[in-house]
Amino acid sequence: LFATLDTTVRKVVFDNLPFLLSDTVGFIRKLPTQLIESFKSTLDEVREADLLVHVVDISHPQFEEQIDVVKQTLQDIGAGDKPVYLVFNKVDAYTYVRKDDDDLTPATRENLALDDLKKSWIARANTPCIFLSALAKTNLEKFRSDLYGMVREIHAGRYPFNNFLY
């Protein structure tokens, strides 16, 4: 069902700003009842987080449904108000079906080129988002910069007089 059930926590330091990064398993819809107890610690990690980095495999045919499942799960566990940074990974593996110019049938998500999909998501997302490829190392510096800015903002709000870090 999953590659791992355990949450991994690592200390990360960006430009002298330390923070803890937890990697949890992905959420699935209709989790079998007998597995819910196994995921309690993961759900606790999510509830206690200051920022959620939601990594989405954009090459998966149902990535939008997966996003909806995660949003609903966050609502269900009382973490729907957490700030989320939406990371669309695997842009190098994204494919679409090109429509002929004379095709009059309505376009669907499967007909959107990556640039059009980006515009669509950026326009409708109520959260910051980025499109990258971890494998091809595309847009990783922007991801790092964005994440640093978000963590710095949280840190500055929590420790307003501790500005020696940034």
Which residues does each predicted region cover?
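C-terminal-of-GTPase-core extension/linker across diverse P-loop GTPases
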Residues: 3, 61, 65, 72-166
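Short alpha-helical interface patches
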Residues: 33-39, 100, 115
